[in-house]
């Protein structure tokens, strides 16, 4: 089978569409001597995602603001792979409140059964792989393959361009019999090939509806009898997202499993090292934090255009395979300030703003002086390392999953991050003092491994609340209250208490 490049015929220019295509080394494209009919392709983003995509925390749908640059169509049949790459000048793009549709002008083809593939905003890496196919089988393999999501410069699955989402979109190929002797005028009725595509990326965001007091958020512990007691405040909240797949499937699998779905760490050793999580997941954006967006009312679809977000890739597993070390998370960093009652005698007056905080696990009090904290909080039996957690520069950390399957943190079992969704995590309340650092960044015993991700927020090894990556998702101690929202775009939101 030979690779052909097809051109829209000049007569179609009168319809207001033009095509651009690249010359190939194969035979000439279909012409009036071989083509006996006309066809067109219509593409739409789903008004509803497939079953399961919006099971958790859905609150509505958002049409999006998509930047459409081009549409590439592969028509397979009659021993040929015909390729058309159409610019926006060649397309009719309709963006509505909840969906986007793209329609091509009619073009000439040979009638018969065809398999039609279509990709919006094709990236150079994907285009090179698909165009290298010389037969139907090779094209199918290339279309179902996994590609780098963000690491190939110029071939990222999503970028923000002039406040528009420019991202690759794809869907299942469609097999359809193209009728003979259909004119250009009738092609949209008799020979239209409808294809549903999805955005390959995910949008993640974070908001807070707890109201600040003097610029800070109160951390109120819940005592017996549901009595709230203020123990600290947290301010300067910023978030980042990590542990999403380095690769994505161009064509989403029927079960929506992502390329590293089989990676399930059974121990910390499984998580760390060159063949652990760093091989599969992206941690590169942890230092690029965004301010948590303040809301005065529950998050809704109308807030989507105003809330800053980050792109991530699809990251999923079989239902029983979600672990803390293989699930996409949002990390929140804040500035901790204990209330007067939480300080050991004389320590609050000695503390300098922005300095390290030392929490004694024996006394349950904070210290400005490390030596004082160590002396007052000896290890069990009075020997060994003191039981003190250091909060460097008073920084405190909280984490949340993107799309947990329940609203009760003690019953979380999975958190699938699926393409074409917007996941918003909303902080509704702070209940506890958080962690001393980010526990979910893999390390490597080999200091020369260039792929080891940087962890700008290493936790104190004395922090007893630091979770292990092999643990299932449920947490028995709730640190904040969160609600997450996902948006076609399906929008999800849920509230979380930290």
Swiss-Prot record:
This is Minor fimbrium subunit Mfa1. A lipid is attached at residue 20 (S-diacylglycerol cysteine). One of its GO terms (biological process) is cell-cell adhesion. Residues 436-476 are annotated as: Disordered. InterPro entries: Mfa1_C (IPR029140), Mfa1_fim (IPR047786). It is found in: Fimbrium; Cell outer membrane. Residues 20-50 form a propeptide. Belongs to the bacteroidetes fimbrillin superfamily. FimA/Mfa1 family. Structural component of the fimbrial stalk. Minor fimbriae are composed of a structural subunit, most often Mfa1, and the accessory subunits Mfa3, Mfa4 and Mfa5. Mfa1 interacts with Mfa2; this anchors the fimbrium in the membrane. Fimbrium assembly occurs by linear, head-to-tail oligomerization of fimbrial subunits. This is mediated via insertion of a C-terminal beta-strand from one subunit into a groove in the N-terminal domain of the following subunit. Keywords: Cell outer membrane, Fimbrium, Lipoprotein, Membrane, Palmitate, Signal, Virulence. Its main location: other. The record marks 50-51 as: Cleavage. One of its GO terms (cellular component) is cell outer membrane. Residues 1-19 form the signal peptide. A lipid is attached at residue 20 (N-palmitoyl cysteine). Structural subunit of the minor fimbriae. These filamentous pili are attached to the cell surface; they mediate biofilm formation, adhesion onto host cells and onto other bacteria that are part of the oral microbiome. They play an important role in invasion of periodontal tissues and are recognized as major virulence factors. Mfa1 orthologs from different strains have highly divergent sequences, and this correlates with pathogenicity.
């Amino acid at each position: 089978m030979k690779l052909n490049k097809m051109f829209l015929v000049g007569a179609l220019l009168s319809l207001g569409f033009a095509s651009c295509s690249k010359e190939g080394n194969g035979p000439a494209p279909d012409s009036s001597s071989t083509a006996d009919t006309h066809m067109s392709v219509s593409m739409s983003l789903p008004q509803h995602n497939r079953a399961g995509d919006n099971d958790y925390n859905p609150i509505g749908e958002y049409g999006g603001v998509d930047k459409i640059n081009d549409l590439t169509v592969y028509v397979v049949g009659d021993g040929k792979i015909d390729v058309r790459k159409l610019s926006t000048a060649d397309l009719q793009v309709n963006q509505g409140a909840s969906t986007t549709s793209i329609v091509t002008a009619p073009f000439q083809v040979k009638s018969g059964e065809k398999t039609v593939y279509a990709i919006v905003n094709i990236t150079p890496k994907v285009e090179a792989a698909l165009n290298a196919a010389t037969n139907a089988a090779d094209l199918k393999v290339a279309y179902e393959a996994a590609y780098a999501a963000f690491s190939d410069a110029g071939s990222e699955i999503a970028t923000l361009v002039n406040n528009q989402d420019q991202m690759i979109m794809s869907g299942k190929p469609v097999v359809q019999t193209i009728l003979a002797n259909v004119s250009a005028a009738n092609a949209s009725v008799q020979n239209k090939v409808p294809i549903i595509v999805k955005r390959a990326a995910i949008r993640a965001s974070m908001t807070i509806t707890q109201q600040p007091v003097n610029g800070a958020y109160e951390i109120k512990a819940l005592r017996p009898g549901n009595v709230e007691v203020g123990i600290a405040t947290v301010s300067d909240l910023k978030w980042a997202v990590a542990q999403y797949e380095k690769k994505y499937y161009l064509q989403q699998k029927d079960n929506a499993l992502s390329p590293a779905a089989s990676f399930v760490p059974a121990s910390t050793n499984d998580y760390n090292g060159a063949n652990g999580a760093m091989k599969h997941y992206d941690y590169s954006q942890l230092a690029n934090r965004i301010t948590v967006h303040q809301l005065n009312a529950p998050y809704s679809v109308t807030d989507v255009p105003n809330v800053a977000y980050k792109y991530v890739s699809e990251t999923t597993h079989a239902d029983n395979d979600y672990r803390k070390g293989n699930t996409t998370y949002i990390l929140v960093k804040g500035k901790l300030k204990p209330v007067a009652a939480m300080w050991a005698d004389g320590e609050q007056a000695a503390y300098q703003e922005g300095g390290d905080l030392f929490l004694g696990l024996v006394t349950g009090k904070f210290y400005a002086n490390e030596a004082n904290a160590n002396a007052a909080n000896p290890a069990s039996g009075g020997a060994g390392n003191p039981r003190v957690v250091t909060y460097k520069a008073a920084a405190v950390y909280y984490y949340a999953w993107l799309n947990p399957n329940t609203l009760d943190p003690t019953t979380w079992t999975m958190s699938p991050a699926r393409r074409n969704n917007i996941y918003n995590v909303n902080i509704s309340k702070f209940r506890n003092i958080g962690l001393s650092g980010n526990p979910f960044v893999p390390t490597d015993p080999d200091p020369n491994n260039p792929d080891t991700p940087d962890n700008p927020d290493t936790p104190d090894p004395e922090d007893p609340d630091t979770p292990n990556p092999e643990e299932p998702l449920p947490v028995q101690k709730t640190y904040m209250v969160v609600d997450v929202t996902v948006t076609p775009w399906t929008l999800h939101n849920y509230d979380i208490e930290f």
